[in-house]
Amino acid sequence: MAKLAFENDEVPVGAVVVNNGEIIGRGFNQVIEKNSISSHAEINAINQASQFIKNYRLKNCDIYVTLEPCHMCAKAIVDARLSHLYYGAKEPKTGAIESIDKFLDREDINHHVVFSGGHMKDESSELLKKFFKSKRAKKASQKNLF
């Protein structure tokens, strides 16, 4: 899923929602394509899974994401009542699970999600580095045109 985002010139983050070993929702970043700040991979995967089971509550489902979720996505994961979150690379600037905040550890949230990070982190990090390196190179070449 992250590779699809990369191919579409979006930040390469992908997510899947799984129920009993079956993928019921897939998503990748489509913020630019959809002109929507909420079209993050996690939310797109959650929306697809909710449509699939015809319920916004995804009890007994897990979500796998290539990058540590932001606050918006962490809240969506809680509200969807997902059981487990597995993510790849840490996000030092906006990661709300372990990096800049520990949102899922809060006592006052209405549902607690078990989480684990570092899954396939090298692959996730490499794709992100490649994406941002190409963005910087493109920006530098555009500066040289003027």
Region roles according to the model:
Residues 33-36:
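Conserved Nudix-box catalytic region and its N-terminal flanking loop in Nudix hydrolases
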Residues 13-21:
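Short beta-strand scaffold segments in enzyme catalytic cores
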Residues 24-31:
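Short beta->alpha transition motifs characteristic of CBS
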Residues 2-5, 15, 25, 41, ...:
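Small-residue (primarily alanine) positions within well-ordered alpha-helices
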Residues 38-39, 43, 47-80, 84:
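Helix-adjacent hinge/juxtasegments
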Residues 1-8, 56, 69-146:
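Zinc-dependent deaminase
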Residues 9-13, 59:
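Short, basic and Ser/Thr-rich N-terminal targeting/leader segments
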